[in-house]
């Protein structure tokens, strides 16, 4: 059974392993320089400290999905002044996709955003990530903008969910 919860320091090795596996699954989908750069960053000695700082920060949201003691998905983002949150990343390891874990993590992120007084959750994604786009649309996110050649030669779509 998959359990979604806030990340803890003891999760950091599993979090990084999950993060790397998710990014490796983007090989051949996203630009190589982008993917390999993220994977390389996750392997740096300073990366665990970066994750630990985010876990401890009151303006950050880091959630994990755990299955049989193993981190199989995660969502991370920031609560910003002005009442909105930014979902920086959400991902599930390939062998655990299509099981509702991404939806559970996104629901958890929205819940944490509400608890922090947010009235809007925003994110961006590449148009080639069709499963992510479907999830965001199914959860009520609406496109607010399109950024051409935004990063690493990729276009990005800016989405938001307005909370009531």
Task: Describe each model-derived feature in a short phrase.
Residues 119-122, 126-164:
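C-terminal "cap" of GNAT-fold acetyltransferases
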Residues 10, 116, 124:
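Residue-level signal for short amphipathic helical patches enriched in basic/charged
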Residues 6-12, 16-89, 93-94, 106-108, ...:
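Acetyl-CoA-dependent GNAT
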Residues 70, 89, 93-107, 114-116, ...:
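Conserved glycine-rich acetyl-CoA-binding loop
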Residues 1-3:
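Extreme N-terminal starter segment of soluble prokaryotic enzymes
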């Amino acid at each position: 059974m998959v359990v979604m919860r806030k990340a803890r320091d003891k999760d950091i090795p599993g979090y990084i392993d999950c993060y790397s596996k998710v990014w490796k699954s983007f090989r051949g989908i996203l630009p190589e320089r982008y993917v390999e750069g993220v994977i390389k960053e996750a392997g740096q000695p300073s990366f665990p400290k970066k994750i630990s700082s985010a876990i401890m920060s009151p303006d950050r949201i880091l959630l994990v999905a755990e299955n049989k003691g193993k981190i199989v998905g995660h969502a991370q983002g920031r609560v910003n002044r002005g009442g909105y949150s930014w979902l920086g990343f959400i991902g599930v390891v390939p062998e655990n996709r299509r099981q509702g874990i991404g939806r559970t993590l996104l629901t958890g992120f929205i819940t944490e955003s509400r608890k922090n007084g947010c009235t809007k959750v925003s994110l961006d994604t590449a148009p080639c990530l069709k499963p992510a786009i479907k999830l965001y649309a199914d959860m009520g996110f609406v496109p607010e903008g399109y950024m051409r050649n935004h990063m690493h030669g990729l276009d990005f779509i800016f989405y938001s969910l307005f909370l009531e």
